[in-house]
Design a protein with these regions (language model features):
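Active-site and donor-binding regions of nucleotide-sugar-utilizing enzymes
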Residues: 17-189
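Nucleotide-sugar donor-binding patch of glycosyltransferase catalytic domains
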Residues: 123, 129-138, 177, 244, ...
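C-terminal amphipathic helix plus adjacent low-complexity
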Residues: 306-391
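Short acidic low-complexity segments
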Residues: 5-9, 82-93, 261-271
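Catalytic donor nucleotide-activated moiety binding site of glycosyltransferases and closely related
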Residues: 47, 57-65, 230-264
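A donor-sugar binding/catalytic signature common to diverse glycosyltransferases
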Residues: 112, 263-307
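Nucleotide-activated donor-dependent transferases that construct or modify glycoconjugates
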Residues: 11-22, 205
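Conserved catalytic-core segment of nucleotide-activated headgroup transferases in glycan assembly
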Residues: 25-35, 42, 185-251
Length: 391
């Protein structure tokens, strides 16, 4: 009766865990996985451990990607596309982990090869950023995405552009681990010009979730500024996915009654159709700049142009290549470890066994016949406290 030979390390399909988050982060991870058809994939919403997980369960983190609202959107996307889900990577046994953020690095992936993928634009580097960088005891998430890359708990960090590589190195990220690949969703902004969004030639406002994440945001002043820029043209607001949509609609209706408001939809396609883009702190500014729109932003536009993600149309493919490199290194290490284990377990020839045994016994014999070993043991006073000295 024939038996199937067990799969070797080279034949076994690698297992890859993809840690998602916001819809932008989730779609990025999906695109990367599609470029790794030789691997078995599993996805999970963003997660933490210890007190972070306790706070999440208590619904104290609803303003973050850990919250139930954004977690549900992530899971809805994964279910809609029929993607395998392993919540919190509980199944284990992964050969590689991709994550959209290193502000929290779960304990159960810290011994695995990790690839960190930049999501988009960073939060401004204010006082919390400088405190977190100086005081290592502070958690990175206190400063928001400004501290991205500073955990050091990854093997490779895939970033959007050479400008961002320089920025992350200046912030303190290890230069030797950073790879410029471009980032999915922002590597081909021209594709968004092919859309069926019904409006054209308007002023688009991409608002932020600043208030939901406990940052200052004078919304009344901001809407007044938008009206001034629009100067009578059609004004359309695209709300941030994490924003309190009901409150935002109420404010816009009171201050800009002629404006249209969208809580859902593709912001990038709306940007492609607009004449003017107004943003606060948002990655959508990259799309506006890449498409040559008139842009008004809280971000320094000269800095945005320096940091603009590479328009290489191949970010997911480039990141997949980085993953393959790490998987190959991991496979080689496992093969070397197996070879060493097999060599150490192999039986020695009989004549060599006898010689090695005789040599070991001859070397060990003096320890058992020395007079100091045969003399009675006297304990010092220190033995009263559990410590025994031989004299």
């Amino acid at each position: 009766m024939s038996q199937t030979a067990p799969a070797t390390a080279s034949q076994r399909r690698p297992k890859v865990l993809l840690i998602c988050g916001s819809l932008n982060q989730t779609t990025q991870m999906h695109q990367i996985a599609q470029e790794l058809p030789e691997a078995d994939h599993a996805y999970t919403p963003y997660y933490g451990h210890g007190y972070i997980e306790a706070l999440r369960r208590a619904r104290c983190l609803e303003f973050t990607v850990l919250g139930y609202k954004l977690r549900r959107r992530c899971l809805d996307y994964l279910e809609r596309h029929g993607l395998p889900v392993d919540p919190h990577g509980a199944a284990g046994g992964y050969d590689l982990v991709l994550t959209c953020s290193d502000l929290i690095v779960p304990r159960n992936i810290r011994r695995r090869p990790v690839v960190l993928v930049q999501e988009g634009i960073l939060d401004p580097a204010g006082l919390p950023f400088h405190l977190c960088r100086s005081l290592k005891v502070l958690p990175l998430w206190l400063a928001g995405t400004a501290t991205t890359g500073l955990s050091g708990r990854y093997h490779r960090f895939c970033v959007a552009s050479e400008g961002y590589r320089d920025l992350f190195i200046a912030n303190g990220a290890p230069a030797e681990r950073i790879v410029v690949t471009g980032i999915p969703n922002f590597d081909d902004c021209r594709k968004y010009e092919r859309n069926d969004f019904p409006h054209r030639h308007f002023v688009l406002v991409c608002s932020s979730d600043a208030r939901e994440t406990f940052k200052l945001d004078n919304r009344r002043k901001f809407i007044a500024r938008c009206l001034a820029v629009a100067a009578g043209r059609q004004l359309i607001f695209k709300l941030h996915p994490n924003e309190n949509a009901e409150r935002a609609r109420r404010e816009i209706a009171a201050l800009a009654p002629g404006a249209l408001v969208y809580a859902t939809g593709c912001a990038e396609e709306m940007i492609a159709n607009c004449d003017v883009l107004i943003t606060q702190y948002s990655s959508t500014v990259f799309v506006g700049v890449a498409l040559g729109k008139e842009v008004h932003s809280y971000n320094d536009l000269a800095e945005v142009r320096r940091l603009l993600p590479q328009q290489n149309r191949s970010a997911a493919r480039n990141i997949a290549a980085v993953c393959r490199e790490l998987l190959q290194v991991e496979e080689s290490a496992l093969a070397a470890a197996s070879a060493v284990s097999a060599a150490s377990a192999a039986p020695l020839p009989a004549t060599r066994v006898a010689r090695v045994g005789r040599e070991r016994w001859t070397a060990a014999l003096p320890r058992f016949v020395t007079p100091s070993r045969l003399a009675p043991t006297r304990r010092s006073k220190a033995s009263l406290f559990g410590r025994t000295r031989l004299r």
